């Protein structure tokens, strides 16, 4: 990797990272791990102090409070991302080659893998000023990638339309490395991400919908706290009375609230008000707020299981696995854009579950993604057999590259699903954006790069 440039642009003053090598910088990294694992509200200063084998009071000598530790953690990651994306090439003044940018961003993300998902899910807990600073950095990084994509598309005589959404998808893919613990080497991760980036760069932008280069979403999944009524569930929460305050109505209202404000900021009274009942009526169905969260997560897990079971029943063992995989992706995109808050909650609030429920949910998520990966491997193997039969070694080489092994297939599944969900979140789950992000995800699962 080309060494980062030394004249890095400083991030906004409100989000300056601690000086490298300082005690405060060390605290920031440990805090990032804890906030990523537990969530902002569930993390206590004692958790961070315990990891550093010191007392909380010792931390306060370097950092004033918990929020400042959180902000330092986010600033450290954001600054590293900005540095990784800056122009490091010595050839001319144009944008650096796409592969160079993606490699640099991937290696930086890999070095922070245990904490890379921090501001993907926890950014809503930043102050508005700090959140805006994160978005500014994110926009600059995305713009640099989009410039490199346009260069690549012009080299292949392609219309540059869709470069912005392709760049957003690339960042989602790289960020997804922080969402799993699939066994990969750093070089394997870099090879996979650069291969995906080249595929996405040449993905036709005709399905862009509302995802123009100016408004193509937030690839790192930063929560803005704003959603359309359809996406937030505000218009779909039933106004229930008395005995009609059913379990499903309460869960629907809770999902909308948890999505907008975060689990810890929501009260049973607020959920009850959304469905037109007193909080006491909700306690007839749920012993407390945590039970509502568990029920909401379980409902989404069931939604995924039903999707996979129905799909498996429809596609028998003799079906073309590539066709089956595309069909499954199409169904997932439909669910993601119609149940966006449900899916966001399913991935972002596990830290608020009990240890037992959290483990159970993570195991369910792993099983679900493994079913995707099995189908992807079958599709890739079938493609290899087909290309061998036609005697096209160049195509075969591309199909097998970083695509057939189980671990890399699982990583591709994580990346593809992240592109759909991040794209939906960044466009407030606007229906017109579904086709574009589904198209990009399809290029991740089944590469379409010309030979």
What is the predicted function of each stretch?
Residues 153-227, 231-239, 362, 381-444, ...:
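Hydrophobic/aromatic-rich alpha-helical bundle segments in the mid-to-C-terminal region
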Residues 86-113, 309-341:
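Hydrophobic alpha-helical connector segments
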Residues 21, 29-32, 36-42, 50-186:
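Ordered, small/hydrophobic-rich secondary-structure cores
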Residues 26, 30, 34-70, 261-291, ...:
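Helix-turn-helix
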Residues 23-31, 48, 73-77, 81, ...:
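Generic hydrophobic, amphipathic alpha-helix propensity
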Residues 128-154, 356-384, 388-391, 397, ...:
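Amphipathic alpha-helical packing segments from all-alpha helical-bundle domains
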Residues 171, 235-304:
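Conserved small-residue-rich
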């Amino acid at each position: 990797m080309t060494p980062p440039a030394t004249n890095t642009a400083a991030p906004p003053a409100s989000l300056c990272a601690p000086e490298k090598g300082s005690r405060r910088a060390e605290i920031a990294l440990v805090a990032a791990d804890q906030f990523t694992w537990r969530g902002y509200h569930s993390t206590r200063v004692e958790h961070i102090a315990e990891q550093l084998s010191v007392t909380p009071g010792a931390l306060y000598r370097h950092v004033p409070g918990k929020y400042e530790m959180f902000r330092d953690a986010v600033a450290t990651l954001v600054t590293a991302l900005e540095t990784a994306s800056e122009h490091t090439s010595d050839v001319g003044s144009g944008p650096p080659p796409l592969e160079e940018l993606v490699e640099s961003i991937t290696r930086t993300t890999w070095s922070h893998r245990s904490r890379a998902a921090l501001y993907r899910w926890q950014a809503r807990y930043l102050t508005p000023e700090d959140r805006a600073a994160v978005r500014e950095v994110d926009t600059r990084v995305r713009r640099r990638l989009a410039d490199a994509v346009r260069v690549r598309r012009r080299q292949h005589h392609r219309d540059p339309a869709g470069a912005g959404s392709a760049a957003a998808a690339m960042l989602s893919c790289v960020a997804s490395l922080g969402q799993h613990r699939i066994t990969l080497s750093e070089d394997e991760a870099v090879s996979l991400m650069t291969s995906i980036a080249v595929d996405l760069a040449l993905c036709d932008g005709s399905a862009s919908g509302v995802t123009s280069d100016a408004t193509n979403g937030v690839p790192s999944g930063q929560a803005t706290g704003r959603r359309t009524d359809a996406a937030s569930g505000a218009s779909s929460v039933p106004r229930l009375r008395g005995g009609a305050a059913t379990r499903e109505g309460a869960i629907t209202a809770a999902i909308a609230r948890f999505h907008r404000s975060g689990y810890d900021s929501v009260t049973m009274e607020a959920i009850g008000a959304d469905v037109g009942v007193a909080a006491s009526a909700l306690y007839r169905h749920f012993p407390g707020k945590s039970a509502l969260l568990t029920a909401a997560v379980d409902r989404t897990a069931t939604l995924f299981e039903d999707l996979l079971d129905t799909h498996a029943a429809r596609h028998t063992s003799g079906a073309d696995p590539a066709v089956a995989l595309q069909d499954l992706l199409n169904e997932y995109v439909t669910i993601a854009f119609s149940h966006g808050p449900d899916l966001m909650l399913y991935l972002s609030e596990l830290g608020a579950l009990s240890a037992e429920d959290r483990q159970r949910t993570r195991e369910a998520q792993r099983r679900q993604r493994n079913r995707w990966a099995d189908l992807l491997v079958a599709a890739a193997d079938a493609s290899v057999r087909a290309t061998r039969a036609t005697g096209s070694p160049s195509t075969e080489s591309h199909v097998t590259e970083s695509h057939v092994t189980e671990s890399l297939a699982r990583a591709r599944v994580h990346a593809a699903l992240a592109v759909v969900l991040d794209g939906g979140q960044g466009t407030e789950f606007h229906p017109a954006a579904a086709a574009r992000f589904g198209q990009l995800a399809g290029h991740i699962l089944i590469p379409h790069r010309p030979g």
